[in-house]
Regions:
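Preference for long, amphipathic alpha-helical scaffolds in soluble/luminal domains
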Residues: 1-335
Length: 335
């Protein structure tokens, strides 16, 4: 990986990201931005601290002994609706949503607490023959689960491979995916491409590579944000955790990670990314999902939803800034 050319402002931002309060951000900055190797002593030290300090520690300390958060496991193992409630509700603090964040932060099955999470999904969600399993679920759910379990270290498990098979089957003719319409894809359904991006390149089959190319073209044709008659305002705001919501930052991260950093059709979205950069070199966390801000166009009973926030919205964000710098580095390396 090419080294980053840093100006004085950039170096201040790097130093900020390297602070030890969030070892996950420090680890990814060392590896993805500064190009350090995994066997580098500082990299190894930062990685070892991820479950012991910062966001991951805060999430893990709330985990129940059985590996879950919030609701108890259904007493009857074939209680399908009970398992859905158990894994997914309340949004966005139940087991599924917290597990997705832990997978983003870099934790793997080397940690027994992560193995407990995976066991819950394997026990119910991926059981063949379940009346509500990966054969009947939406691509957003399948993609998120495949991404999470792949990052946890289960990409070789046959049950995870079945998830990828399902994503291949569910891709629309236009190259996209859609949880709600069978006739066409939508930019909102980015989770399958995120699952592909999590899969090491050497483990991608020819069919997956073809699906990536078709899916990437779907996004590039739309410049990552052109869908419908008018611009959808929340897509132009940056968020984390993302859950299953889309924005331009997600699109840029996926396209550059999947090898399309040189494509000229990214330029409008890259201009938006650069325009949103503050004078001090950072980027804001604009909103925490669900984003009900201007232009959202929908209402939600907030009593049924609990936001999962790692950082304060409206302020410079280490996670958003790290993601933006990753994108810009890939573009620079490809040029």
């Amino acid at each position: 990986m090419a080294s980053v050319k840093l100006g004085s402002k950039d170096q201040r931002i790097i130093n900020w990201l390297l602070e030890e309060d969030q070892p996950s951000v420090r680890y990814y900055t060392l590896v993805d931005i500064l190009g350090r190797k995994e066997n580098d002593p500082e990299v190894r030290e930062a990685y070892s601290r991820i479950p012991r300090r910062g966001w991951a520690k805060d999430i893990l300390k709330l985990q129940k002994p059985g590996g879950y958060w919030e609701r108890r496991e259904p007493s009857w193992r074939k209680d399908v609706l009970g398992w859905i409630e158990f894994l997914y509700r309340p949004k966005y603090v139940a087991t599924n949503w917290r597990a997705l964040v832990l997978s983003d932060l870099g934790l793997t099955s080397k940690d027994k607490r992560i193995r407990k999470i995976a066991d819950l999904f394997f026990d119910y969600k991926l059981r063949l023959g379940s009346p509500f399993n990966f054969f009947t679920e939406e691509a957003c759910i399948v993609g998120n689960t495949a991404r999470m379990l792949t990052r946890f270290g289960y990409s070789d498990d046959y049950r995870v491979k079945k998830l990828y098979d399902r994503l291949l089957e569910d891709q629309r003719e236009d190259g996209g995916w859609n949880c709600f319409r069978p006739d066409r894809g939508t930019l909102d359904n980015w989770e399958p491409l995120a699952a592909y991006a999590a899969l090491p390149k050497q483990k991608r089959t020819r069919k997956i590579e073809q699906s990536i190319a078709k899916g990437a073209e779907f996004y590039l044709q739309r410049k990552l944000f052109e869908e419908g008659k008018s611009k959808y305002a929340p897509w132009f705001r940056f968020h984390y955790p993302t859950h299953y919501y889309y924005d331009i930052l997600i699109g840029l991260d996926l396209m550059t990670k999947l090898g399309y950093a040189e494509d000229k059709r990214l330029r409008p979205a890259l201009r938006i990314l650069n325009d949103k950069r503050l004078t001090d070199g950072t980027w804001l966390l604009d909103r925490v999902h669900p984003d009900l801000g201007p232009g959202a166009g929908y209402d939600l009973d907030v009593k049924k939803v609990r936001r999962l926030a790692l950082e304060e919205p409206g302020k410079p964000s280490k996670w958003i800034t790290l993601t933006a710098l990753r994108i810009l580095k890939r573009v620079e390396a490809a040029s």
